[in-house]
Amino acid sequence: LIQLDEGNFGAAMLIRGSKVIGSDLRSSEITPQSAFERFQQNRRRILTGVVTTGVGAFFASRIPGFLEPETTVHAQALPAAPSKYTTSENQTPFAKATHYNNFYEFGTEKDDPAKNAHTLRTRPWTIHVTGMVKKPQTLDIDTLLKYRSIESRIYRHRCVEAWSMVIPWDGYSLSELINLCEPLPSAKYVQFFTLVDRKQMPDLPGGYDWPYTEGLRLDEAMHPLALLTFGCYGQVLPNQNGAPIRVVMPWKYGFKNAKSIVRINFTDKQPRTTWNEINSREYGFYSNVNPHVDHPRWSQAHERRIDSSTFPRTIPTQMFNGYDEVASLYSGMDLKKYY
């Protein structure tokens, strides 16, 4: 089986200088999008021969994104300035990050969202901000896109299922939107609501209390790392990755990152969240990445990193996913109890 390195596509539109703050990854080391697209075409021709063999077909069918169509390579560009939030770790290739997803509204298999999310209509799109705020808002997605400058942040992404990626997300701090709405002193939590529409989500599974909801403490949502996200890899978000607007909390497990948001509500009580309500023993409200607190059914001490390697590597999981700057948010808390 031929191993093909897809490189670090996506960052070329995001990193302009010779070196970004806090990183040893130079722009000269990043594959330009045009080169990536040529590579994908060549890869297809090579793989056409490779996977006709029994061994090639067997392995290729089991590697995330290996033979998936690059349906979003030509998506609308989203210019983003470089930021200090980056990493020298190898990025997950675009094809893998967009074809190995959890988005149950479009199916429960990892490749279902990429197959089914084309039915999602992202224009027009409105976000309602409600609850304990001085200035409730009804905001159009394009208004939000222009509200602040978009920046690129290359974050580690850790799923509760013990796999991980490194993804360049594009957006601005969630605190910018929160400050616009001016929460009341009594507001302590933020709740996010994902779109639910059976016409756009014909594969919406039963057995769940839709819409999908997630929540954060207000101080968590205000942390500079919390990202209101509109794109990835220098493009608008693909539908399967939570278009047109989602949040990214890099120190938490991935299910805390609400996708396709239509409402944000401020409250004084810990809000209902979907997975915590389904099984609070397995999915805590906080769900911070913690290698010392196992999921009841598997260890969280290690993770399978999905990157440009043919097969995922197993690496140790870091506390808070390596984002130690959030530790002060949980000072004095028993993180085995408040998981």
PLM features per residue range, with description:
Residues 6, 42, 50-51, 98, ...:
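Generic hydrophobic/packing signal
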Residues 76-339:
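Structured, non-membrane catalytic/scaffold regions adjacent to prosthetic-group chemistry
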Residues 60-65:
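C-terminal segment of classical bacterial N-terminal signal peptides
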